[in-house]
Design a protein with these regions (language model features):
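Dinucleotide-binding Rossmann-like beta1-alpha1 core, especially the glycine-rich loop
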Residues: 82-159, 163-165, 307-309
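C-terminal catalytic lobe of FAD-dependent flavoproteins
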Residues: 318-389
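Glycine-rich FAD pyrophosphate-binding loop
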Residues: 59-78
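Short hydrophobic core segments
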Residues: 42-44, 221-231, 364
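N-terminal Rossmann-like FAD-binding beta1-loop-alpha1 element of flavoenzymes
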Residues: 41-65
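Helical element adjacent to the flavin cofactor pocket in flavoenzyme catalytic cores
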Residues: 169-217
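Intrinsic, low-complexity polybasic segments
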Residues: 4-5
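Active-site substrate-recognition segment that forms the wall
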Residues: 55-60, 82-84, 119-124, 225, ...
Length: 389
């Protein structure tokens, strides 16, 4: 359905000029290109959601431009843990079909990115050990029966301390979000997606009631379709109310004394642990209403560190490698915002909160259908931007 890639606009004068035309004004190259180039779709935001969508659209032949306020993949995607959690205990009921479908897509999604980028994304399928609080256990007794440990906990993960909490074993995967996003960025570039980085969108351009592009702090870009994938910043642009807010999460990274010390993702009421294949161990994470503040604080990092040591005492020998904070895009009802808006040509794919990494493949799939005017495989009514009008 998409046309040819953007090309320069050529003059079609009716008669030859009597004298040479005056030279064009000395405009920045980026501005000049924006005047003579029209994309099929402009995506605002270069996190994993925007990158995945751009790849899906390019597969369908669309000419795509990603406009990113910083560097692609350096905000929430960079700070994420990468647990591919589709367990009903923690997933809102309305989101469960999308979460389950996206988790199933992940092996193919990750493999494709690895093949096309030549990079590894560290997709692991060792599973998750989940310690439940008494309250969660009482509400999910059936899950305790269906997801019991395959072998005693002391054999499954010997480094774990003894615990009295109910425990589940979940066949979940994990992925390295930084590696995943880097691979998606390279894949998008290899497929011909255009990028404008360090370029903050200030407004969506509206002409005759329809979206026709974006205006940035540097210039303007044109396209008949614009998708807001700006994460925690989504509410700051566009003609439609997009009530996202930043939800801060602090994490730290330990270097395990042995790469085999911990093999499974471990989730407990106070902390979660995510081992990487290279011996790193991510420890997270807080959920804080702190505006756009991305600073870490020592007391919080120390609290997370103590919680990790309580789960795995041998981590006392682990070195602290790094700590950071990221801003997840939260929404009033804890559900993503996916779909077309009341402004023709303007779409939204944001508000994934803690599930952006998990939901990237399915978001790309359903939003590509919506943008092309096809009916998506899943009912998106619960995620419609119109629910906030």
């Amino acid at each position: 359905m998409w046309g040819q890639p953007p090309s320069a606009v050529r003059s079609s004068a009716a008669r030859p000029l009597l004298r040479p035309p005056p030279p064009p004004p000395l405009l920045p190259l980026l501005f000049y290109n924006a005047q003579v180039k029209i994309w099929d779709v402009i995506i605002v935001g270069g996190g994993i959601i925007g990158l995945s969508l751009s790849i899906a659209l390019r597969k369908r032949g669309a000419a795509v431009l990603i406009v990113e306020r910083g560097e692609p993949g350096r905000e929430a995607s960079h700070a994420a843990g990468g647990m591919l959690v589709d367990c009903l205990i923690e997933t809102p009921l309305a989101l469960q079909p999308l979460a389950t479908a996206s988790a199933r897509l992940y092996p193919e999604f990750a493999h494709e990115l690895e093949i096309e980028s030549g990079m590894k994304v560290d997709l692991r399928d060792q599973g998750t050990i989940l310690f439940l609080s008494p309250e969660h256990a009482a509400r999910n007794s059936q899950l305790l029966v269906c997801n019991s440990l395959p072998i005693p906990l002391a054999q499954l993960e010997p480094a774990l301390a003894d615990h009295q909490l109910p425990v589940l074993y979940l066949k979940e995967r994990s992925v390295d979000p930084r590696a995943l996003t880097a691979a998606a960025w390279k894949t998008a570039k290899n497929r011909g997606v255009d990028f404008s980085s360090g370029d903050e969108v200030t407004t969506i351009t509206i002409t005759a009631g329809c979206a026709t592009g974006v205006t940035t702090t540097k210039t303007a870009f044109r396209a008949p379709k614009v998708v807001n994938c700006a994460g925690a910043w989504s509410g700051q642009i566009g003609p439609t109310n997009v009530p996202t807010r930043p939800v801060k999460g602090q994490m730290l990274c330990l270097l395990m004394p042995s790469r085999t010390l911990l093999q499974h993702v471990v989730r407990a009421p106070e902390v979660y642990l995510i081992p990487r294949s290279d011996g790193r161990l991510l420890v997270g994470a807080t959920v804080e209403e702190a505006g756009f503040d991305k600073r870490t604080d020592l007391a919080t990092i120390q609290r997370l560190h103590r919680a990790a040591l309580a789960l795995v005492p041998k981590l006392a020998d682990a070195k602290i490698h790094d700590d950071w904070a990221g801003l997840r895009p939260g929404t009033p009802d804890a559900l993503p915002i996916l779909g077309a808006t009341e402004t023709p040509g303007y779409y939204v794919a944001t508000g994934h909160f803690r599930d952006g990494i998990l939901l990237a493949p399915i978001t790309a799939e359903v939003m590509t259908a919506v943008i092309e005017g096809r009916t998506p495989e899943f009912d998106l009514t619960a995620f419609s931007p119109a629910r906030f009008e």
